[in-house]
Amino acid sequence: MRTMLTCVARSALRQTSMSAPARACFSASAPALSSRSRNYSKQQQQQPVARTGLKDLHPLPESMREQLESSDTPQEPYTASGNSNDPAVHSSRPASQPAEPEVSPRVAAPGLVNGSSSKNGSPSSASSNGASSSGASSSGTYSSGNASIPISNISEAWGTSFAGLGERSFSKEAIDVLMAPINEADVEIKPDGLIYLPEIKYRRILNKAFGPGGWGMAPRSETNVGQGIVSREWVLICQGRFVATARGEQEFFKPSGVPTASEGAKSNALMRCCKDLGVSSELWDPRFIRQFRKKHCIEVWAQDTAGKKKKLWRRKDDPPFEYPWKETGTA
């Protein structure tokens, strides 16, 4: 009996000793597993994400990269990403004119002195006492050899200058070309009855009077883009002298038409400037307009594809209106 009780007691003690370490093991392992998962999640959050840098997208030569990385701030003419840092690249304004001419006026325009030639066809010579052989003197003249030529018409800031305005008239040959009667065969009429001279005709008259390169147009203001209209002020320069200024206008119907409208505004300004030279001045004479319409033009009824009728003007020697208009009779 005693032996049986001893065996039962030993088995009970053995089971108790085995269950205690097991409970301790399980209780100790549970928090260890949870802390390991928390540490793993923190490491996952703190791990940096790989991104593509600007240096990989825009590789630069090693010499340029070392130069840019060595300095604290980007140097000209490139930033650290390889983009240009020059203000002239990002500006639409033309570069400023040089303070002094780089080419001698005698080489660029032989025989011309401030826009006109002397009677014998040679440039007027100036006294060479104290004048250097090259460079600009303090009196505003450019010396080359034994001749001193004014440079006021070479480096003028035509955005604000009025140099040569009303100084003297042009030569008789130029005046005869500018003031010649208008050739009625060159005059066109719009469907609304407005008569005009094509812009290329004005350029041909100026080329005939002053020669190619003897005149030009310079912008007087920035391009003004409004609601469906572009305008800009231009100045007409002939033989290095200010002649006239006018603001040209041109309509446009969509944003992609702004560049073309800018060119149209320049042509419109040229036409208005030519009024001061007397070119085709008859186009602003009401009596000439009435006589020209009666002699060379005809007003007709025209019908569009929708059946709407409208009065339109055309020259008598022009063919009838085409699609989408169809002439139905004389008005």
UniProtKB/Swiss-Prot annotation:
Keyword Secreted: no
Compositionally biased spans, kind Polar residues: 40-49, 70-86
Matching Pfam families: Mgm101p
UniProt transit peptide range: 1-40
Region spans: Disordered: 32-143, 312-331
Location (main, coarse): mitochondrion
Superkingdom assignment: Eukaryota
Residue ranges, compositional bias (Basic and acidic residues): 53-68
Low complexity composition-biased segments: 114-143
GO biological process, one term: mitochondrial genome maintenance
Entry keyword set: DNA damage, DNA repair, DNA-binding, Mitochondrion, Mitochondrion nucleoid, Transit peptide
Annotated compartments: Mitochondrion matrix, Mitochondrion nucleoid
One cellular component (GO) term of this entry: mitochondrial nucleoid
Keyword check for DNA repair: yes
GO MF term set: DNA binding; single-stranded DNA binding
Annotated family: Belongs to the MGM101 family.
Task performed by this protein: Performs an essential function in the repair of oxidatively damaged mtDNA that is required for the maintenance of the mitochondrial genome. Binds to DNA.
Protein name: Mitochondrial genome maintenance protein MGM101
The species this protein was found in: Mycosarcoma maydis
